[in-house]
Each structure stands twice: as C-alpha cells, then as structure tokens.
C-alpha cells in the first residue's frame, strides 16, 4: 500500500515511510539487420515544425541519436505529429514506422482520499489522461495544484551539440532530406539544445551528471541528461485539475484524467526520461533507446493524510505498427519480460515494398520495476526490485 506523507509532499511506502518512485526502465529493441541509411528523401506527407524562437518551448520532440527516431509530447505521451509516417517511432530512422503509439498506464484501488474507495486508472493510451507540468506544493508539502502546461515543453539535450554536425538531427526533426535541410533549421535545433542545456529542470527532477558533486545543477560545469547518455529527452506531467501560479493562486482548471477511461484524478506526477547512445546500426546500442518512468503519488489539494493506493499496477502500454499495420503479430517471452512485434508475412508492403529493406522486429524489455520494500532473498536488504 502507498500512503500519503504531507511533510514529504508525496505518498510513501507504508512499511518504511520511503518515497515512492515507481521506475520502469524499458528498452526499445529493434533488430534483424544492420544497415546505415542515408536520408535523401522522405514521405510527401512530411510537415515542417518550427520551434518558437521566443520561448523555446516545443510541444513535441524526438530522440534520434542513433538508428531509431522516437517522438514524444510534453505530456509524456505519444504523438504522431512528428514522423512523416504518422507514427510515434520509426526504425530504421528515415524509413518505415515501427511504433504507432505508447504510454505509461496504471491502475489502483484508491482509499481514503475523500472521493470514495474505488478503482481508478490513469496515464495515457490512445487517450491522454495527463497534462504537462509538475505538481506544486507549499513549504510543508501540501499540494496546491499543478503548474500551467504552457510553462512546460519537451526538454532535449545532447552532450556534443556545440561541436556536432546537426544536419541529420535537423533533417529528421523537420522531416526533410539531409540535402534539403537549411542552415536556419540546423541553427534552430542547435539553439534549442543550448536553451535546454542552460535551462535544464534539474530542480524538478530531470537527471544530470553532477560533475563537481555539489548537489546543485550548474550548466557551466555539470552535464544535463541521463549520466553517460549521448542524448536525453525529459518530460513531466500530472493529473491534478487545479492549475496555480508560482504563488499557489488559482489561474485555471483542466481535468484531463477522465479523458482516458473516465476515472477521477488521483494526484500523480509522472516524469519520463528517454535516452540513447550514438552508436551505428551494426552495434546493439545503436538500435536501442532507454526509457525510465518515475511515478509520484502526491494527491490532490484536498487529499487527507492517510489516503493510499492499494494493489497498484504500473505498466508500459503500446500499439506497435510495423510498416503495414494489417499484418503484424505480437508475442512475449515471460522469462525475459520481453514483449515484441514482428511481421506476419515474409514481406512487408512498407519496408520491402517502399524502402527495399527486410522487415525488422522489436519490442519492450522491462529492466527494472519499483522497489518492493521486501527482503525476499533474506539478505537483510529490503531495497529490492
């Protein structure tokens, strides 16, 4: 059971009064062939996306450091607005669609929060139950409301942005061929990287490499993003309807939770970290991206102490579309905690028919779940996953 702790400002594990951060690390695996691809042309359905040069606040962005292009919206859920395929993820990059949509999903028995004991479901599938922004608390940890979504965007950094040739990066972002990308488009992408580097939301929970070990993010010393990664994207979202300003005063109301499956909001903050490594297609890491989802149960402004989530389930939801979506099969390997998609026919209309490539396969591998607070192996350590 997960109970509320007002001093911490979040819910805590009942047994040891620890912060609940449910982290599901997911690896997106795509394989069957290794081939470097040049971007010379894209689908005519491609649309240009221009970053706002004044507020540097893209509503969507893409992880594209290696052989996968994976888009996400600032609410931490899928978007099909970035890829010319109308999909969330493309593999290999600049070719066919791989994942149509995905998102984090949870369900729990909510007890003692004043809305009646009931099962509630939250997160994102085809419908989005969250909005961008963090949950705002006072100095005592009382929930005041949620941040205005307009103050948030998809933060994206790459550690070599200042010196790297960003032609391929910009071409993928703008859905144009590498020969057609403009100097202005490359400059906009570079400027966004710089903006996010110097405005990295470490205070809200975004990961970074604390180079000098002082516990505070310094953009002139530290490295933003998942430590060691070549590229990182980060979002923060919540289901608290009341929107407040920095002083905690009400400025709006947006109840997104019922948009998913009709359930009332719980008071969840979800942080998504996506990262990848700049390896080529012949290296396994060049065909993988990593995802970490941190879920905090903080409650609503009127949630009493002692409210709890019982029997919580937290999972990755996905609708994979592998090229031609009408001939896809899915499977799972329980021992490896691996779910995958593969083509039901020998040939695929998109990969074989358009790009003259063998059809790939891929899926999701759960690497680590939340700590269960139980000493199952009797080694004296209750921090087990």
Predicted regions and their residues:
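A long-range scaffold signal marking pre-active-site subdomains of enzyme folds
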Residues: 35-385
């Amino acid at each position: 059971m997960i109970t509320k702790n007002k001093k911490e400002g979040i819910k805590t594990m009942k047994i040891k009064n620890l912060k609940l951060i449910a982290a599901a690390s997911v690896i997106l695996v795509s394989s069957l062939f290794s081939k470097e691809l040049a971007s010379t042309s894209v689908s005519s359905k491609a649309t240009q996306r221009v970053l706002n040069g004044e507020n540097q606040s893209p509503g969507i962005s893409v992880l594209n450091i290696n052989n996968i292009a994976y888009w996400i919206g600032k609410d931490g859920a899928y978007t099909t607005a970035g890829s010319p395929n109308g999909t969330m993820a493309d593999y290999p990059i600049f070719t066919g669609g791989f994942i149509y949509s995905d998102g984090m999903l949870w369900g729990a028995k909510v007890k003692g929060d004043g809305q009646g004991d009931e099962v509630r479901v939250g997160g994102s599938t085809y419908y989005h139950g969250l909005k961008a922004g963090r949950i705002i608390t006072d100095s005592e940890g009382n929930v005041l409301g949620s941040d205005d979504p307009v103050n948030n965007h998809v933060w994206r950094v790459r550690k070599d942005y200042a010196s790297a040739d960003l032609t391929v990066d910009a071409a993928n972002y703008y859905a144009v061929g590498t020969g057609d990308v403009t100097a202005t488009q490359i400059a906009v992408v570079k400027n966004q990287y710089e903006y996010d580097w110097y405005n990295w939301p470490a205070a809200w929970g975004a990961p970074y490499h604390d180079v000098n070990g002082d516990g505070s993010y310094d953009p002139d010393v530290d490295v933003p993003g998942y430590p060691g990664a070549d590229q990182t994207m980060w979002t923060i979202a919540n289901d608290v309807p009341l929107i407040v300003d920095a002083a905690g005063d009400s400025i709006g109301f947006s109840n997104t939770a019922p948009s998913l499956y009709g359930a009332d909001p719980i008071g969840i903050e979800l942080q998504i970290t996506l990262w990848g490594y700049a390896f080529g297609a012949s290296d396994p890491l060049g065909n993988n991206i990593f995802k970490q989802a941190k879920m905090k149960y903080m409650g609503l402004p009127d949630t009493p102490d002692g409210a709890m989530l019982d029997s919580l389930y937290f999972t990755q939801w996905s609708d994979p579309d592998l090229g031609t979506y009408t001939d896809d099969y899915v499977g799972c390997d329980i021992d490896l905690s691996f779910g995958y998609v593969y083509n039901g026919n020998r040939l695929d209309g998109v990969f074989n028919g358009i790009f003259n490539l063998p059809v790939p396969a891929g899926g999701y591998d759960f690497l680590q779940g939340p700590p269960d607070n139980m000493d199952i192996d009797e080694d004296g350590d209750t921090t087990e996953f």
